[in-house]
Amino acid sequence: MWRMRSDTRLLRFAPLWGLCVALLSLSGCAPLPTGGVPDALAPTAQARYEWLNRITWGANTSTARVVEQQGSARWLQQQLQPQGASLPESAQATVSAMTISQTGLTDLVHTMEKQRKDADALRDDIAKKAAQQAYQQELNRLAREAATRHVLRALYSPAQVQEQMTWFWLNHFNVHLSKHNLRAMLGDYEDSALRPHALGRFRDLLGAVSYHPAMLRYLDNDQNAAGRINENFARELMELHTLGVDGGYTQKDVQELARVLTGLGVNMNSGNPNLRKELNR
């Protein structure tokens, strides 16, 4: 059985992942390798802890010791270029056993769609209701897996800056889990669209997010077509994702971008968004 880790990371997660953390029984993290010479970026132990609290999910003794021995500049440089950061064995075993870690997005969505259609096709009302509830419960379970995996990585991965930035971008490019089957997509959305680009170029990150089925479905671009323009994705792309409110664009700009994006929808048969020429304007 894992024991709860007693450091400030858990306190910082409380308002964000309270439900998920309550479900977990977590083990301590092994100390990181040490070595090197300290520098002047964090001259005192108190300053070092405050600095770590700002750029990690909470300062702890082992990380502070590494920063002291390596030096803040060297440690931060390593954080900005993480090389295959690994979790403690027990945490990694939990992550590896998850459905979202073992099943690709396309197969997972196909499985869930089949379950939904099979439930809807039942003629007996009682059986149909039970099957539909089972479908919703499975979607909830997949969403809990994604949340649990995120928390385990954030608490125990040595790549703390990457974890902070993954969380930041997950909030910036958020999707709503109550919509359609997005709960089945959340794990892949984080792993394939956000996490690989969390420390990279914003343009690459924006592209990965804009082409992911979770975002396209959440903001209705799978319904955006010639003759029935849906401006939702175009507006959010400008207002929330890039330029911001009062960012210098006009309603006409939103309309034109929406036309550019017509036909960019979701094709789970190939696992990638698909531009349908008959819908493009």
Q: What are these model-derived regions, one by one?
A:
Residues 61-172, 176-187, 193-195:
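N-terminal accessory alpha/beta regions
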